[in-house]
Structure formats: C-alpha cells, structure tokens
C-alpha cells in the first residue's frame, strides 16, 4: 500500500472507530509546514469545534510499513484513540487576544536554511544560521506541551510589531520553559541511577564503561529546559550566555546538539574548533533524527565583547585584533625620538 492509498483508507474508515458523537464530524487532510518537517495532517472536527489536533499521517505510515503484521484496523484504532484522548480545550478568543497570550510566549530555535520556506511566513530573528521563532503554550500535561506557532497572519491579528513580540517572548520564555544546565556526566549518572534495576549485567557493564569514558572527556555542559524538549532556545534567553561565561570563568564553544539542547564547552585555548565541527557533523549524521537537527556548525561566545558568532568568525576576529595590535606596536616603535630643539639666540658674543 502506497502513502496515498494509506491516507484514503484512513479518511474513509476512521469514523467507524469513533464514538457516535463523531458521526457528523468533518474528516479532512491538509499539507502542514512545520519547523523542521512537512507532513500530511489528518483532522477530525466535530460540529462546533474551532480547534482540533492535526495528526501526522506520514509518521503513522512509516510505523505501519515498519511493522508488517499491523493491520489498517489497528492503525485506525490508534488514530481514533488520539482523536478521543487529545481534544484541544482552548478558548479561541483567548488565543487571538494578545494580552491573554503574552505571558505564555516562548521561543524555539531551528535551522534557518532547513526552514527557509516556513520562515518566510513567520516572524523570526536570525542568530547566525539559527532562527528564533515564537510560540504560544496552549496546554501542558504528562504527554508534553501543546503549542501554537505564531505566523505572520496571527501577528497581524495581535496588532503588534515583530520587535514587541520578540521582547515579550524573551521575558516569558524562562517562565514557560525553565532553563536547566547539567554536565554530561551528571546526565549519564542520572540515567544510570534510574535504569540500573532494569538493566541486564551486560547493559550495566556497558553503561559503567560509558561513565568511565565520560569522566575522561572534556567537561561538556548540556543546556536545555526542564522538560528537555525543544530546549535549544535556552541559550538565547536574556543574559544566559553572560551568566554561563561567569560560571565557567571563560569564553565557550556552543555545539548545536539538536533542537532539544545545546552543548557548551569552555574555551581554554586548547580546543580545536574544526575538530568540534567534525564531531557535530558525525553526530548529526549518525545519531540525530533529521527533524531534530539544527546545523553542522559550531558557535562561540566571547565573554569580553559579549558576542555570539560562528567559531570560525571568532577566530578571524582574533586574528584581526592581533594584527591590529601588532601594527599599533610597530608604529609606536618606529616613532622617532622627539629631541628638544636648540633655541637660536638673536645675538652671539
């Protein structure tokens, strides 16, 4: 069964698996453009509902193909469960009222290049090749955060400028998505403590080896939020990088681990930015899902000049500074000594 057949099968049969109050529901699909991904979404809207969850059919189709024994009946039952259990309880008037949502704003970070088309229709700010976008937290439960992506039409509805939106989102983000900083070793140790009772002897030994290796690695810090979902934007919270610099007592490199977190490594002058870039590329290619990737670059924060930039640009700036300092020093050395002039007398004896 190809994807189009799968979509039609779901659309034609989904109501058979829903309660009676869905018999007059409208079933539709639409092409969704989201950050880091595009997909065909299914919506089942009951009479009188203004908002309804959009279910990612591409994701379900991939799961269906990966499990040959799964029937379309099983797929439809799963979708029906999602529709029933995850209605969006939102006051639409409240969502469209900026005063009601401005304390629920938060930022996300994504690849500007990978999301070029989406960003054309949404307010955003660029930080090098990373894009900051703005979102409204609609609801939060054990399954995660429901949110609404602010695009240009919603910004127009709010009647505010993109600059005002950015300012307000930066204020509210730390409250909506609280920051969290941990060392990688601490996170591995936390995982070890949580899972040790469920591990086989071989798995336990492997994890112990990982802990030993992590203790021998440079000190990386993980920057994310307390939910550890969509937490890469924390690095751009107001004064966060300055505070991180004070904590480390040094400049630092920033590695875009994924949309969920950034890695921070103190710049002690011994770290090779090119080596870090190669590491990011390898991890992206082998361990990070395409929808969760940021970029293959490495960034740097200069604590003295308070500058966030690509690591290679920082290196260029340092060379420019050194060249300018050498030029100034050379000019000072070449300056001729100014000897006092002998004053001529008008009359000689």
Please name every model-derived segment.
Residues 1-36:
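N-terminal alpha-helical "arm" segments
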Residues 2-3, 19, 70-77, 285-287:
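Basic, alpha-helical nucleic-acid-binding regions used in initiation and control of genome expression
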Residues 28-222:
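Charged, alpha-helical interface segments at or near domain boundaries
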Residues 232-245:
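Short amphipathic alpha-helix segments
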Residues 250-254:
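A short linear hydrophobic-aromatic micro-motif
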Residues 257-263, 267-294:
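C-terminal structured domain segments
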Residues 281-318:
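TerminUS-proximal long segments
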Residues 325-349:
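Non-Sec secretion/translocation targeting segments of pathogen effectors
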């Amino acid at each position: 069964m190809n994807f189009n057949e799968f979509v039609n099968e779901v659309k034609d049969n989904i109501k058979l698996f829903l309660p009676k109050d869905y018999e007059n529901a409208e079933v539709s699909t639409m092409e969704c453009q989201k950050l880091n991904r595009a997909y065909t979404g299914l919506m089942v809207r009951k009479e009188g509902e203004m908002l309804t969850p959009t279910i990612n059919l591409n994701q379900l189709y991939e799961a269906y193909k990966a499990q040959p024994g799964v029937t379309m009946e099983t797929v439809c039952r799963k979708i029906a469960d999602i529709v029933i259990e995850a209605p969006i309880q939102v006051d639409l008037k409240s969502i469209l009222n900026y005063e009601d949502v401005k304390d629920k704003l938060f930022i996300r970070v994504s690849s500007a290049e990978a999301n070029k088309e989406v960003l054309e229709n949404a307010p955003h700010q660029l930080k090098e090749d990373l894009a900051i976008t703005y979102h409204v937290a609609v609801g939060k439960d054990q399954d995660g955060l429901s949110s609404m992506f602010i695009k240009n039409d919603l910004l127009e509805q709010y009647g505010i400028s993109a600059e005002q939106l950015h300012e307000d989102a930066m204020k509210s983000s730390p409250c909506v998505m609280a920051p969290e900083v941990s060392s990688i070793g601490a996170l591995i140790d936390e995982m070890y403590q949580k899972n040790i009772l469920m591990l086989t002897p071989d798995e336990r030994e492997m994890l112990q080896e990982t802990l030993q290796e992590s203790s021998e690695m440079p000190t990386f810090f993980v920057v994310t939020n307390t939910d550890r979902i969509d937490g890469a934007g924390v690095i751009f919270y107001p004064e966060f990088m300055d505070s991180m610099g004070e904590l480390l007592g040094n400049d630092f490199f920033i590695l875009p681990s994924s949309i969920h977190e950034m890695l921070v490594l103190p710049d002690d002058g011994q770290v090779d930015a090119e080596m870090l870039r190669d590491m990011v590329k390898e991890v992206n290619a082998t361990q990070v899902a395409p929808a969760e990737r940021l970029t293959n670059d490495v960034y740097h924060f200069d604590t003295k000049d308070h500058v966030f930039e690509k690591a290679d640009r920082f290196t260029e700036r340092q060379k420019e500074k050194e060249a300018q300092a050498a030029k100034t020093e050379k000019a000072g050395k070449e300056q001729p000594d100014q000897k006092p002039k002998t004053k001529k007398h008008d009359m000689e004896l």
